Amino acid sequence: MASFGQVINPMTGENTWQERDENYDYHQEVANAGFGDMLHDWERNQKYDAALRKTIAAMREAGREVHVLDIGTGTGILAMMALRAGADTVTACEAFMPMANCAQRILNANGYGDRVRLIRKRSTDIEMGVDMPHRANLLVAELLDTELIGEGAIGIYNHAHNELLTADALCIPARATCYAQAAQSALATQWNSLKMLASLDGDILLKPPAQLLQCSGEAALHDVQLSQLPIDSFHVLTAPTPIFQFDFQRKQAREQQRENILRLQIVRPGSVELIFYWWQIELDDRGEQLLSCAPYWAHPELAQLQRSNSSKPLANVVPWRDHWMQAIYYIPKPLQLHTAGEQFYLRCYHDEYSLWFDAHQTEPPSQPARRHCCTCDLHMTYTRNRIGQLNQGTRNKRYLRYLEQAVHAKESAHLLVLGDGCLLGLASSALGAGSVRCLEPHRFSRRLLGAIAKHNQLKNVSFVESVQQLQPIELAAITHIFAEPYFLNSILPWDNFYFGTLLLQLLEQIPALSVQISPCAARIYALPVEFLDLHKIRTPIGSCEGFDLRLFDDMVQRSAEQAVALVEAQPLWEYPCRALAQPQQLLNVNFDNFGEDKHSHGCLQLTASGDCNGVALWVDWQLAADESPRSIVSSGPSETVVPGQLVKWDMFVRQGVHFISQPTKDRRQTDAGKRQLDWSINFKPRLGELNFNFSLRSSSEKSE
């Protein structure tokens, strides 16, 4: 039985009712759970298995029975590893019901169904004597995230030791160490603070007001694939430094809040702006099985990994994982240090779920510190990517080139700016526009831009919450409609076609509206690629460490078909891929005729060798009709695409990705000959529908 759910269509801005399977929420939760990514992490799987084998063997040699508790069993793979290694009993718990039911089927299929006691509860809800007959003396769990403690590991381990484990219980992993490395990066700080905006001649157009300069920003982590940060875009100022250790085995409770003040020495002059963060775990009690999430330059096994992965780029020789990444934390007030060897104090905090940092020239007093938070509206309103966009020099220059020409071409230019947080619209006032009206429906964004306009003494700027507020006499005076475009509700690049929807609304008010529109057009491009790793998030597992997990694949595939969009947004600069052809234009949209339905189709010949496991998609915005490359602002590659080589992507926007279904092992040989990508696209702008279809075929096959 179908049901209806209300969703916001980002392209039309309207709430619409969408027919869904009655189990849609279930399918969405399964498809987005992300278990598959972990199961492709060969290092994690092998080291958990080795730790279980060594630990259980040592317990056996000591004459101890082995009673295992697996918290958050997922597919049941750790429970099966424990039994294979010789455990006497295994109890596993899983609170996510679809996963628990799948785990039971997987256990049955692998011959372990009657040997694992599966409890469909959270570990903190388990009752001794009811759910478990006795306490366990070996805990195996994967309760960690990028921040280590963000999924509640502290509380879960404390409860387990108090209620579920014996006094002498061992844990896998046994310990964790968190690392910090101070760094300076003009690139990364663009994700956190607002710079001045200057004209093409270097004249200052907009200065950030005091509220932005004094704001500490958000303490929340910025999780990234740190190894993909261009090596020439940052300087590390200190060696990697242990900041916190977590002993998961000790009976004594792990503290929920701690402070650690470290005296560190810089290796080169610079400004302490960022903290690079990662962690390392010792899976067994002896610390023989180490797993590090360090970026490649700080990885303890880099030399060995480089030898065994000599064909890969250096940044990709360390094991890839998307469930445990690295993080950037931004220092509230960057600390300038002038001499190599100079010392400073790094103040590190954690509570039960998160970490935060600060830097000081002199030793600060040890005292409880609250997490810093945004007080300027910028960080609470916009994403890291959007803040980076606002600072992006090359991008801004292309818009400013258009705006300078537009403003100076008329004796008095009157602009209507459509979009959220458009500083460039404010800049047009500083360039000499007669008046600027900014559409700003969001309160915090409107308040921020109002403060910037006031600080820069822009007297001819006004704000409206909707286009319907504009009176006919105001619309009649407008000479230019401008947008980047950017809207807060947008996820995929073409969601910003909401710009076209707003133009249609304006035409409804004044059908004869005659103005210059920028961007005047947009084009969607596609590029077939070979992802080095990203495709694994949608690739079937098959078998893992000798266990058959095809039932898990089937469950995820069924749910993905119901709940996962055919195209999803990904920051591709973090996920290397090789181009297999030149980009091809799929769709051209003219904003002076936005309401027209469009359909097109074609074929892309793959000209470079490699497995096509995805298609990257993006939008190029054409600012003016002059066809100059300087009039194009792209959300795709930042350099010319060369088939067979890695693509360099814009780092301040997410691209669209369509994953090509990965064949099973027995089909890969056949599919390797498929060298053509058929595509089709259907666009219905008034309904906010944009649908893609892609399929691989060999040149001898007929297209459908």
Curated annotation (Swiss-Prot):
Coiled-coil-forming residues are: none
EC number, as in UniProt: 2.1.1.-
Leading EC class: transferase
Could you tell me which SUPFAM superfamilies the record lists for this protein?
Answer: S-adenosyl-L-methionine-dependent methyltransferases
GO MF terms, alphabetically ordered: histone methyltransferase activity; protein-arginine omega-N symmetric methyltransferase activity
Q: Which GO terms describe its biological process?
A: peptidyl-arginine methylation
Methyltransferase among the record's keywords? yes
What keywords were assigned to this record? Methyltransferase, Repeat, S-adenosyl-L-methionine, Transferase
Glycosyltransferase is among the record's keywords: no
> By its UniProt entry, which PROSITE patterns does this protein fall under?
SAM_MT_PRMT
Please state every residue range assigned to the domain named SAM-dependent MTase PRMT-type: 14-356, 366-704
The entry assigns this protein to a family as follows:
Belongs to the class I-like SAM-binding methyltransferase superfamily. Protein arginine N-methyltransferase family. PRMT7 subfamily.
What does this protein do, in the record's words?
Essential arginine methyltransferase that can both catalyze the formation of omega-N monomethylarginine (MMA) and symmetrical dimethylarginine (sDMA). Specifically mediates the symmetrical dimethylation of arginine residues in the small nuclear ribonucleoproteins SmD1 and SmD3.
* Protein name per Swiss-Prot or TrEMBL: Protein arginine N-methyltransferase 7
Q: What is the lineage of its organism?
A: Eukaryota, Metazoa, Ecdysozoa, Arthropoda, Hexapoda
Encoding gene (name): Art7
